[in-house]
């Protein structure tokens, strides 16, 4: 374990000041996300989604962001999966983007709601056929007998729906509506820059600096 304790990196690529950021956190996120794309980072759209059940027992996993606007952050999944069940019990969740090459993190907290059926239908229709069939074949988070059993279900639904599978009723989108968004920029000597946007309850956002 001593080797783990010795692992460290000094951060020095950038800085973050209230005078330089967008007053709207969605504008600031868009700025950073475009920079992550321009830097050709591998899958900059990956994020950690943390949920908790009714008892407060947490779980986390990597998912893909599929939409961002003033209404919130959108992702899609199986509603009957563990995360779907936890969100039904407890709609409060957190997202984390970590762009290590840029020494940046974005942490988002808020309440999750389902997207409209129309939004879910539109995104589902844009997916490759194999992924749409997979949404039917996978009983996500449930115990299965074997890989062969999963592939048999895939063949079954492929034969049933062909090239035009509809969206399963148990599959669709969620939108996290944020009430807090933190932007983190690594700095030397662990004196990192942390700016927190909080929703004031009206139409605006308040920006504060947090101690690292």
Curated annotation (Swiss-Prot):
Reaction(s) catalysed (UniProt annotation): pyridoxamine 5'-phosphate + O2 + H2O = pyridoxal 5'-phosphate + H2O2 + NH4(+); pyridoxine 5'-phosphate + O2 = pyridoxal 5'-phosphate + H2O2
Molecular function in Gene Ontology: FMN binding; pyridoxamine phosphate oxidase activity
Pathway(s) served: Cofactor metabolism; pyridoxal 5'-phosphate salvage; pyridoxal 5'-phosphate from pyridoxamine 5'-phosphate: step 1/1; Cofactor metabolism; pyridoxal 5'-phosphate salvage; pyridoxal 5'-phosphate from pyridoxine 5'-phosphate: step 1/1
Keyword Lipid biosynthesis: no
Family: Belongs to the pyridoxamine 5'-phosphate oxidase family.
Subunit structure: Homodimer.
Protein name: Pyridoxine/pyridoxamine 5'-phosphate oxidase
Naturally occurring in which organism (per UniProt): Paraburkholderia phymatum (strain DSM 17167 / CIP 108236 / LMG 21445 / STM815) (Burkholderia phymatum)
Gene from which the chain derives: pdxH
């Amino acid at each position: 374990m001593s080797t783990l304790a010795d692992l460290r990196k000094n951060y020095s690529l950038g800085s973050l000041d209230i005078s330089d950021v967008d007053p709207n956190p969605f504008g600031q996120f868009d700025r950073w996300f475009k920079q992550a794309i321009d830097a050709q980072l591998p899958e900059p759209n990956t994020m950690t989604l943390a949920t908790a059940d009714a008892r407060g027992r947490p779980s986390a996993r990597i998912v893909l962001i599929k939409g961002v606007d003033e209404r919130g952050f959108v992702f899609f999944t199986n509603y009957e999966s563990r995360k779907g069940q936890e969100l039904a019990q407890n709609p409060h969740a957190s997202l984390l983007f970590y762009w290590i090459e840029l020494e940046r993190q974005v942490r988002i907290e808020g309440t999750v709601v389902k997207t409209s059926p129309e939004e879910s239908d539109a995104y589902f229709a844009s997916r490759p056929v194999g992924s749409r069939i997979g949404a039917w074949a996978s009983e996500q988070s449930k115990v299965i007998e074997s890989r062969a059993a999963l592939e048999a279900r895939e063949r079954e639904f492929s034969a049933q729906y062909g090239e035009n599978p509809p969206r399963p009723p148990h599959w669709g989108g969620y939108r996290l509506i944020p009430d807090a968004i933190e932007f983190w920029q690594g700095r030397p000597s662990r004196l990192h820059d942390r700016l927190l946007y909080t929703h004031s309850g009206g139409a605006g956002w308040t920006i504060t600096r947090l101690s690292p």
